[in-house]
Amino acid sequence: MQWIILGLTVIAAGWGGSFLRMRFLRKGRVSLLASEKHGARIRPRKDGPDSLLLFGSLTLTSSSGEDITSLLTGRLKETLLLILFHTRSGGISSRRLSGLIWPDKEEEKSKNVRGVTLNNLRKILNRMEGVKLVFEEGKYVVRFGEPAYCDYVESLSILDDYSPGNDRLLSILARGKFLKDDGDLLFDKMKAEIDDKVASAVLAEAQWRFSNADWANTVLCADILLRIDPLSENAIKFAVKALSAMGQEDEARVRYNNFINQYKKDYDEEYASSFDDLLHH
């Protein structure tokens, strides 16, 4: 068993983040290795009291554990997210906030509706411990303290100083794409910036998981990448290789076929690489 593990580690390390020619050990041995060396796929972070989760479906949970997401009307959600996104750079001014959410209203009218909106938002956040909407130095910010939690805030902290092998990041990202149910054009740029940061980190994570023969979480990384870019060639290569290493070649072929069908639909041409090309190169 030791020589199998050593052999895989040496081969994977030589891969160095690019897809070089590589053949896996026969299916029976690889399946045994994967089951003995690694545990299950990392699970998504669960909702908990005093939490605001933005990856996957936006979820707001009170101190009592009640899901209070439905209290956020469209305007309240926009206000919360705009303030939250700007908090990292020092907050957002009243004028800027009004200009983004109520661009057609005169200053006096927008001031009144802004005041009502912010008061209603504070009432909702007051049902959570450790979350405060405050106005400081002329700008609105959202502050999180114990025991409150926000996956967006934690993800930025991790991504700022990222190194592969981070289970916490994968647990956050496993919930789903950032603001996956939100089609508000107001947040398109912000979502794109988060997607870019996530994709860069998860590609490095996938390479690290693969080089350490962590097949299940290599597949998880591939799934995360494909949510961001359904035609990510790196992602489908990782998925095909890792699933085959786990003895799940049928599933690998299903995913490959789905990929090439989507590729054909989007580009009106056949995908150049065969299943075997991805598996062995």
What are these regions (language model features)?
Residues 1-5:
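Juxtamembrane/start-of-transmembrane alpha-helix segments at the extracytoplasmic/lumenal side
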Residues 6-74, 132, 138-139:
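Short boundary/linker motifs that mark transitions into or out of structured domains
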Residues 46-52, 116-147, 263-274:
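DNA-binding patch around the recognition helix
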Residues 67-101, 121:
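Short amphipathic alpha-helical recognition elements used for nucleic-acid or partner binding
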Residues 71, 85, 106-109, 141-281:
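Intrinsically disordered, charged and Pro/Gly-enriched terminal/linker segments
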Residues 90-100, 105-106, 130, 134, ...:
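Short beta-strand->alpha-helix linker/helix-N-cap micro-motif
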Residues 113:
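A conserved beta-strand->loop->alpha-helix hinge within the catalytic CA
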